[in-house]
Amino acid sequence: MVDMDGVLYRGEQALPGLRDFLLLAATHPFVLLTNNSTMTAGDGVAKLSRMGADVPVSSVLTVSDATARYLASALPASSRALVLGSAALRGAVAGAGMELVDAAADVVVIGLDTNFSYDSLTEAVRSVNSGARFVATSLDPVLLTEDGVVPGAGALVAAVRACVSTTPVCVGKPSAPMFEMAVQALGLAPTEILMVGDNLDSDIAGGAAVGATTALMLSGVRGHAGGHHRPDLVFAG
């Protein structure tokens, strides 16, 4: 299992050794993971292709696709979904059989939404307070881009959470759903899997929680270095 953001690239810039790293990874079963809810697996494949690296779509798991799979397993078909997120996330949720709505939802899904507004926040809060399930793609408060730090999906989740009594189910790293899907895709026991990432709080903590060996890439280390999430291996990147 390999994190994409900060390990393979940052924004639209490939990190040194990208193609060599993926050639090495391809000698074993692998899956690439990202908490970026603005991409589907197909988008991830296209992005890597632009950087000169070709991977099969079956080897990419984005949090948009993982969230759609989670909803399909947790809710009846045609459930009403209020999605605050990108076109990729909305398309994935609709593809999972959910009906996209703007209010009075059965489930509220929060991802990275650059069009987030007071009105959309209001409808999300009203739906959750009326009993809708509350699902977050991730709790990452910020994203690293070529231009610096920008608010992540977790910042928007926090805005809704501040107004409701319901704790959201988080699908993405470091939570269990996405890691369990990745382990299932690999068809291996967790103890046979190496999780490579640059984020102590999501990649390393989540990989360890599922039972994988963890490796920290120093290419873009994030997280609380003084915390309890210590990797088994460390690479300079």
Where on the chain are the PLM-derived regions?
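Conserved phosphoryl-transfer catalytic core
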Residues: 28
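Asp-based, Mg2+/Mn2+-dependent phosphohydrolase catalytic module
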Residues: 2-24, 37-61, 65-237
